[in-house]
C-alpha cells in the first residue's frame, strides 16, 4: 500500500516534533512519500522579500526553497530515504522507483504544497493521503471563535470543498485548496486530516482508526 503524508510547515518549528515524525515514518512497513510545507522559515523570508518589493513569483520561489530545506532536514533524519529532494513530478517518479521513502517540498510558483501532495499521491498510485495539519480535525466553523462549532469526523469531497471555499475555517488553504481537492477527488483518494502535533496518529490511521476527519468520494 502506498501512502502520502503531508506535513504542515509548522511542524518544523519544533525540533522534537520533527524527530518524532522521522521515527514514526521509519517504523511503518508501507511505501511512503512525504511532502513538507515551508512554515515559519518561509513566512519570515517571504515577509522580508515582500517589503523589499519582490514579485509574487519570487516570493513563491522563496517559499518553495524553504519547503525543500524542511524536506532535506527530514531526509537527513530518516537514514535510508531517497537522498535528493525532487523538484518536479518527473523527478519524484524517478525517486519513487527506488522503493525508498521520498520527501518533497514545493514544485513551482503558484502551487501550494497541498497540491503537490495531491499530485504526488496521484503519481504514486496512493490510496490514502494523511494531512498532518495545524488543527485536529475539520469543523463546521472556527472552533476558537465559535464554541458550538461541530467537529466533523466524516466528510464527502463536495462537503469539504464547500467548507474550504466558504473560508469559514481559518487555515483552510493550508489544509487543502480547490486544486488539491480536484486532483484527489478524480482519483478517489481517501484523505485524513489530523492534529499535526500527534505523529502517533499516522500509525493509528494505518491501523484503521480515525483520529481526525476522514474525507472520501
UniProtKB/Swiss-Prot annotation:
UniProt activity-regulation remark: Inhibited by UTP.
Localization, UniProt: Cytoplasm
EC number: 2.7.4.22
Any single biological process term in GO: UDP biosynthetic process
UniProt-annotated binding residues for UMP: 38, 60, 107-113
Keywords, comma-separated and alphabetical: ATP-binding, Cytoplasm, Kinase, Nucleotide-binding, Pyrimidine biosynthesis, Transferase
Source species, domain of life: Archaea
Cystine bridges: none
GO molecular function annotations of the record: ATP binding; UMP kinase activity
Entry-linked Pfam families: AA_kinase
Biological pathway: Pyrimidine metabolism; CTP biosynthesis via de novo pathway; UDP from UMP (UMPK route): step 1/1
Entry's Gene Ontology cellular component terms: cytoplasm
Catalytically driven reaction(s): UMP + ATP = UDP + ADP
InterPro entries assigned: AceGlu_kinase-like_sf, Asp/Glu/Uridylate_kinase, Uridylate_kinase, Uridylate_kinase_arch/spir
Residues the record lists as binding ATP: 6-10, 39, 43, 134, 139, 142
HAMAP family named among the record's database cross-references: PyrH_A
PANTHER family the record matches: URIDYLATE KINASE, URIDYLATE KINASE PUMPKIN, CHLOROPLASTIC
Described function: Catalyzes the reversible phosphorylation of UMP to UDP.
Family: Belongs to the UMP kinase family.
Family annotation (NCBIfam families): pyrH_arch (TIGR02076)
Protein name: Uridylate kinase
